[in-house]
Each structure stands twice: as C-alpha cells, then as structure tokens.
C-alpha cells in the first residue's frame, strides 16, 4: 500500500547538472535584469535614466528593497543551487567506462561560477556571510571579512584552474548554457576572472604582490577574441527570454531611456535652452534643451546599436543625432532617444558576464599600473575599443576611424590613463551596469554629474538587506561596525582612492 502513496512524477533527487544550468541562468538573469526592484546599476552609472519613477535614478536603493532582492537572487537562486550541484556530482559514483577527469572538470567549473558569484556579493556589500553561508541549520551566519573572503576566493580559483584539463570533457552541451561544456573556454574564463580580481585588488597594500602574481599568471591565458566571451544566449520564447526583453517589451512599459551623460559622451554637442519648460521663472539647464544645429563633434559608431533612431535631435545634418534624458528628472518618453532595438526587442539577445573587450581594458590597466604583461597600454586600449565596436555590429573601418579621433586616440585624448581607460571602458560596458559600476569605483572615471534630486552621492556599495538587520541583528551589527558603517558611501576594501 505504501507504493500507492509515492508520486512517481516527483523526482526524489535532481541531477547536479540540472541544478548547475539553473544556477547559470539565475546568475545571468540577475546580472542582466533591468527590473527596478533588483538591478539598478545602469541607472547608477547613468547609462540609462527613468522617465517617470525617478527614485532609483536619484540613488534611492532602499524604498524597493533592492539590496534584499540582489542578495536573495545570488544566495538563494545561484549559490544554493551551485553548492547542491557540487555535492551531488561529487558524490555520484562513476561507471567503469566514465573518465574521472570529466567529473573533476565539472566540479572545477562549478567552483568558477561560485567564485564569480561571491566576488559580486563582496563587491556589492563588503563583508558578507561566507564560511557559514548556505547552511540550512544556521539561520544566523556570521559575516566574514571581505578581504579574507577575497583571499580564499583567490586560493579556490587557483585550485579550480589547476583541476581543469581540456583533454577531457565536462558538462554536456545542454547542461552548460555558457560554453556548452568546452573546457578550453572555461580555462580562459577562469584566467580572465583571475585577471579581473588581480586588477581589482591591485591598490590594496597588503595584496600588491598577490595582485601582481594573479595578473602575470593569468595574462597569457585570457580571452583572445569575442568568440571567448562568457555569454548566455536566451531563447525566443518565455520563460527563457532575456529579462531585458521582458521588462522593456513584453511589459509594454516605457520606464527607461538613455541618459544624457552617456549620449553626450558618445556624441559631443552643444545645447541651447529656448523655453522655461518647467515654469520656474528661469531658462537654464533644468529646462528642456535643444541641440545647437551642426554642433556635433563626432559620433561613436556603437550609438546606432546602443540607441534607437526614433528621434533626430538635429535634422540639419545627415547623421542621426541622439538625445538623452536628464538623470534623476522626469523625462517624457517620446521626447528622447530610446534603448536600441537589439537590446530591447530581441528576446534571445545574449547577456555577458565577462568579455574580450573588458579583458583588453584590464590588460591596459595592468601595464599602466607597472605590471609587465606583454604589449602596450595603447595596443590593449585599441583592441578593447575595436572588440566592442565589432561585437555590436560595427566594422573595423569604423573602429579605426574612431580611434584616430583626437579626443579618442590614446596618445592625444585628454586626461591621465585612468580617465582615458575609465571613460572608454564605461562606454564599452554599456548595458552591463554592475561591471561598469565596479570599474568606475576602481578608476573613479568618468566623472558623473549629480542627478536632479539625489538622496546621496553616487553609491559605492549597497546597504545590507533590512531583513538581515532584523533577523540576524548581531551578525549585521558586527559587519556594519567592521566596514565603517552600513552606508552607500562606505567603500569596499579594495576601493582605496
């Protein structure tokens, strides 16, 4: 009779491979999302701005419990599944015909995804649960020191790379939505992540030697082209469409437009203010603005992909002139350029964790920081920009023309190396808000103007979730005191200057 009470359609256990692919999608979904309740990094970095609901464009991250949703997505949906996948695969007995290295490769790849995810948590919050995290029997985990977590992640990363062997297999094609089980690609990903971590901690005095080793060891083995990009391609049908498509197209909403900050940087121009549009008695920069005819200096070739040509702000010239909204202000959707169709309207548009362009910028940074990887800063700067332009659909000719502009050329562009690399990296990281934010914190470039009605300076971390403050109060208090206060202005340990 007991057999009659067993639901044969309810699996007793889930294969580790299924949990891994689920965790991959959850991670990429969170990093790619434009949902204002969980991911507002594009708004913080003034790549986009809001039309009507302007709280987040003015740096209010508390009202919608954004930190909680970011925290939950990474801990509950990503790390928990990765940990369970690791345990199941590790404990699965091999058949006599199976290659043990295939299993080792799977475990190492899971480790790489875990390390990436924890680095995002540390870079967002600082001290976070780590050594006691993911234990269902411990509802009050301690928060580990952020620097100590990074040191352990570095050790784990080196071990994972040592354990990968591209002469053996790993996940099947349908169990790995990023590299389809290609171990050689995962080795490049691991080294590219290692390079990123090395650059991230390069200004921390106690980690300077470690940073140099990370960079020098990884540099020969990182991404070599856009074919190596760590990207997840979505499907054309729900529920596996790109979350941007869900938020911008399926929803029918008109919540976001490009921000004037990035528009004006990619297409410099002069403005004039003709009317007192906000009726405050004066005509100034708070009013609606018009592009001075013929004042455009140059146009970044990526603009036709980043933005829609629904609005020509200067019909007097042949080239389309784009117009961005004021960060933090109310911006009427029809009056401004829109998000590009490739991004907003393609349900299968891929989302990226790390790409070749970013890696090339990191190598340029390494050289400027005095670390002797092979090449020059200018060469890697040019490679990074070219890779970005080609990725979006531009041509080599367009890239060369752009790089020869006085304002863009590495030898003639204004500012020091941080300004040159930081500004161009910010442009190349368009639509990748978190990565852009992290780079901006390290390089302090470009200089972002204050939004219309800011509640703070530009946030350099998320505050801890309110639920943590309530339910895990002692650990929360210890962490807040340790980092110097639970504020959006408290720097992460590596954010030195």
Residue ranges, per PLM feature:
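C-terminal functional modules
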Residues: 386-497
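Hydrophobic-face positions in mid-chain alpha helices that act as interaction patches
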Residues: 208-363, 368-369, 374-424, 428, ...
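Conserved, well-structured interaction surfaces
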Residues: 51-131, 135-151, 155-170, 346-349, ...
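Membrane-proximal, proline-rich intrinsically disordered regions
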Residues: 1-58, 62-65, 92-97, 446-448, ...
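Internal, well-ordered domain-core segments that constitute the primary functional module
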Residues: 151-153, 158-225
């Amino acid at each position: 009779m007991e057999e009659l009470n067993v639901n044969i359609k309810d699996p007793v256990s889930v294969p580790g491979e299924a949990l891994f692919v689920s965790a991959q999608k959850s991670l990429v979904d969170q990093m790619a999302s434009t949902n204002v309740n969980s991911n507002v990094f594009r708004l913080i970095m003034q790549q986009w701005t809001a039309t009507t609901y302007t709280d987040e464009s003015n740096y209010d991250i508390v009202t919608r419990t954004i930190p909680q949703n970011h925290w939950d997505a990474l801990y509950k949906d990503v790390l928990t599944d990765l940990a369970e996948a690791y345990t199941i695969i590790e404990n699965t007995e091999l058949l006599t015909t199976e290659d043990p290295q295939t299993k080792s490769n799977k475990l190492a790849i899971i480790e790489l995804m875990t390390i990436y995810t924890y680095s995002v948590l540390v870079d967002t919050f600082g001290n976070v649960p780590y050594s006691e995290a993911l234990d269902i029997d411990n509802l009050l985990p301690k928060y580990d020191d952020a620097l100590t977590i990074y040191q352990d992640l570095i050790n784990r990363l080196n071990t994972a790379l040592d354990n990968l062997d591209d002469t053996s297999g790993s996940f099947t094609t349908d169990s790995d939505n990023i590299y389809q089980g290609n171990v050689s690609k995962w080795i490049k990903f691991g080294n590219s992540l290692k390079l990123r971590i090395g650059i991230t901690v390069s200004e921390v005095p106690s980690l300077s030697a470690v940073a140099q080793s990370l960079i020098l060891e990884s540099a020969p083995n990182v991404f070599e082209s856009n074919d190596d990009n760590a990207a997840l391609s979505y499907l054309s049908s729900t529920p596996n469409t790109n979350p941007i498509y869900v938020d911008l197209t399926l929803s029918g909403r008109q919540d976001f437009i490009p921000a004037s900050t990035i528009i004006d940087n990619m297409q410099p121009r002069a403005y004039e203010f003709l009317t007192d549009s906000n009726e405050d008695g004066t005509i100034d920069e708070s009013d609606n603005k018009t592009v001075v005819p013929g004042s455009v200096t140059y146009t970044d070739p990526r603009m036709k992909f980043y933005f829609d040509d629904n609005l020509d702000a200067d019909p007097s010239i042949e080239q389309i002139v784009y117009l961005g909204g004021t960060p933090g202000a109310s911006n009427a959707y029809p009056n401004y350029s829109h998000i590009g169709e490739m991004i907003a309207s393609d349900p299968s548009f891929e989302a990226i964790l790390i790409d070749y362009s970013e890696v090339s910028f990191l190598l340029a940074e390494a050289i400027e920081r005095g670390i002797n990887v092979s090449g020059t800063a200018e060469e890697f700067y040019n490679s990074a920009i070219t890779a970005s332009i080609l990725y979006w659909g531009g041509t080599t000719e367009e890239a060369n023309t752009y790089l020869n502009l006085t304002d863009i050329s590495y030898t003639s562009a204004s500012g020091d190396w941080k300004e040159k690399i930081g500004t161009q990296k910010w442009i190349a990281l368009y639509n990748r808000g978190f990565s852009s934010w992290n780079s901006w914190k390290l390089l302090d470039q470009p200089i972002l103007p204050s939004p219309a009605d800011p509640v703070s300076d530009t946030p350099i971390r998320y505050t801890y979730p309110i639920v943590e403050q309530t339910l895990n109060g002692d650990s929360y208090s210890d962490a807040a005191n340790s980092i110097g206060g639970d504020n959006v202005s408290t720097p992460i340990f590596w954010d030195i200057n």
